[in-house]
Amino acid sequence: MKKMQEPIEDPLSKLTQYSGKTFVIKYGGSIMKNKKAEEAFIKDVKYLRKLGINIVIVHGGGPEISRWLELSGIESRFVDGLRVTDEKVIEIVQMVLSGKINKKLSLQFNIDGVNAVGLSGVDNKLIEATKKYVYKGNETIDIGYVGKVTKVNSEFIKELLKGGQVPVIAPIGCDNKGNVYNINADYAAAFISSALDAEKLIILTDVEGVYRNINDPQSIIHEIDIKDVNYYIKEEIIKGGMIPKVQCCASAIENGTKNVQLIDGRNDHCLINDILNYRGTIISYRSGVKCQKAI
């Protein structure tokens, strides 16, 4: 059980510097299972909006997709962390992400006084995509209706932000032929963040950040310059499922995002507390941000 935290008192002086800026937040499916953390997250977003910070949310939903596939008698299969998505699976993916999670989350925001609009990437061609393949040596693996983002309708998002809305986006993409694709939420959030030249991309995870040694809580790396990402991967400091996550964060910075922060979404009021205290792992071009150890 993660220790719950109270929001830091009077954070206004630190957060007002971001007024008028845009934060893109990736809200993971594994975090949604923590009801108290979800409630605190919604309140944090409400507070940031009151300060004039533009918020865009891209949500996942992997655990819920797996649950509905199991209920439908369909086995969940993955290749390099990507869900194999055939015609039956993509129907369930759309149902869960666009019809269930997206609408529930946007409804919760509106109930709590946040003007939010739930969207799928197919709405107004918000997320355009093309079919993604996995390559292993000389082998090309077809994983079905899994897509990679090619274009984001950033003007549409900006208009929503100007209208005071919080776009809540399900990572479903489409192409000009009418195909619909399942897109990794980390990659969708990174692409959207770059398209908006966002001040921050915040990735909510189920760990405190990137560790030198996953078994040592004190070994968290508080800041990574993107020029060091490949070194950390080569040395297997960054490994497993954290590799694509950090790579897409680095790509976001290379394409316009100011910095990326990976924080533990299980902590109560993580969005406020961790931004203020530079907790988690910050990925950026520079090495000038003073980071504190998580407490």
From Swiss-Prot:
Gene3D superfamilies: Acetylglutamate kinase-like (3.40.1160.10). Its EC number is 2.7.2.8. InterPro entries: AceGlu_kinase-like_sf, AcgluKinase_fam, ArgB, Asp/Glu/Uridylate_kinase, Glu/AcGlu_kinase, NAGK-C. It holds the Pfam family AA_kinase. It comes from the Bacteria. Its main location: cytoplasm. It is found in: Cytoplasm. Transmembrane segments: none annotated. One of its GO terms (biological process) is L-arginine biosynthetic process. It is an enzyme of class 2 (transferase). Pathway: Amino-acid biosynthesis; L-arginine biosynthesis; N(2)-acetyl-L-ornithine from L-glutamate: step 2/4. Substrate binds at residues 61-62, 83, 182. It catalyses: N-acetyl-L-glutamate + ATP = N-acetyl-L-glutamyl 5-phosphate + ADP. GO terms for cellular component: cytoplasm. Keywords: Amino-acid biosynthesis, Arginine biosynthesis, ATP-binding, Cytoplasm, Kinase, Nucleotide-binding, Transferase. Belongs to the acetylglutamate kinase family. ArgB subfamily. Catalyzes the ATP-dependent phosphorylation of N-acetyl-L-glutamate. PANTHER family: N-ACETYLGLUTAMATE SYNTHASE, N-ACETYLGLUTAMATE SYNTHASE, MITOCHONDRIAL. NCBIfam families: argB. This is Acetylglutamate kinase. The lineage of its organism: Bacteria, Bacillati, Bacillota, Clostridia, Eubacteriales.
